[in-house]
Amino acid sequence: MKKSKIICVLACFFAVTFLLFSCGETEKIAPVDIADLSLSELEGYVAVAKYKDVSIALGEKSKEEAISDYLTANSKLNKLPEDAVEYYGAQLKEEYKYHAKQSGRDYDELLHELGLDEEALLKEARTLVYKDIIFAIIQKKESICITDEEKKNFFDRYVTKYAELYGYSEEYVRANLVDEVYQTMLYDKTMEYLIINNDVK
C-alpha cells in the first residue's frame, strides 16, 4: 500500500473518533475513548475554531478535506491527553503491522518503504487525537449522535464501506470492529452537519 493512500485513509477516519483498532500487543494499553470526556475537559485541550457560517475555500480538495483542514489549522491546541496519544500510537503501529503481514513484508521494511519511523507514527497519533477532540467538541455542542435506528438501518452499508476502506473482510469487521463502524457513521453525520452549515466552495 502506498504511503499517500495509507496516510489519507488513516487521517480521514481519525478526524472523528475515536478508537482505532484493538488487537495484539496493544491490549496492554488501556483503551481511550475521547468521546467519554466531558465538554469542559475537551475544551481544556482544544479551543475549536468557528465551525458554523464560515466561508471555506474548496480549491482542489473535497468538501470533507477542506472542512477538516480548516478546523485543524484554525483551532487552538492547548495540550493533548498523553494517554490518548500513547493509545492511538499503539493502534497505528498495529495497523501498519497488519498491512505488512497482509503484503508479506516485515513491519520495519514497510515503514522504511513509506519513509516512516516510530517518531513519525507518534506525530501522526498526536494529529489524530487533536482532530478527534475537535470533532468530539462539535458533536457534544450540537448534540450529534447516532440513533439506534440509524445503527440498524445503515450498519450493513457501513460494514462494506469500512471493509473496503481498511482492507478487512466484512466478516472480520462484523465480528471485531462494530464500534469503529458506528464511529464512522458518527463522523459522516458530523461532516454532513458541517457541510450544510458552512459555505464551502
What is each of the regions a protein language model found here?
Residues 1-3:
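N-terminal secretory signal peptides that target proteins for export/translocation
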